């Protein structure tokens, strides 16, 4: 009947609209995924530091409105220059990759890991107070120390990291918190490396 075919046409049109909507949503999803992908450091798969200011501004706003804690870890590969000089840049890249994997494995899915410098990573630990951040940092340091990084044409190398830890204590400027984590890292290196220091 004509009523039946009209109903069928309406159903097909509705289905077509739904398919178009799903295609649009999938397109948006792939676009978002691609922008995150473009925001990653190609070697270590960690986030590019250009996204750090925006992320910290958002996290600082959450800290202020919800009174939730926030901690940062500044992680630096010890004696990285001598690894590069002794075994070559390819070996240095392998070490950085393995350290980055270990950092990513040691934190939660809700945390953020940035490639901050040549051999430096900055970890944003959301909703994490000082004591909990210290446990995470110590676990990370220990995991890296246990690694044996295989290199082409050379025996596996042992790697260590120094870590500076700072927890947000009310100062409104994110850079102030980064500087505190950096100062703690400097102290960790000055005290002999392969350790965690808090400010």
Residue ranges of predicted features:
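Conserved nucleotide-binding and Mg2+-coordinating catalytic segments in signaling enzymes
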Residues: 36-54, 75-89, 97
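Short catalytic/binding micro-motifs of nucleotide second-messenger systems
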Residues: 105-110, 142-154, 167, 187
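Catalytic-core segments of nucleotide cyclases and related cyclic-nucleotide turnover enzymes
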Residues: 134, 166-199
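Active-site-proximal structural segments of metal-dependent nucleotidyl cyclase/transferase enzymes
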Residues: 55-87, 103, 114
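Conserved metal-coordinating catalytic motifs of nucleotidyl cyclase and c-di-GMP turnover enzymes
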Residues: 44, 73-76, 118, 181
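Catalytic core regions of nucleotide second-messenger enzymes
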Residues: 115, 133, 144-161
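Signal-transducing coiled-coil linker helices
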Residues: 3-46, 50-62, 67-69, 111-112, ...
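Hydrophobic framework residues that shape the active-site pocket
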Residues: 80, 99, 113-116, 121, ...
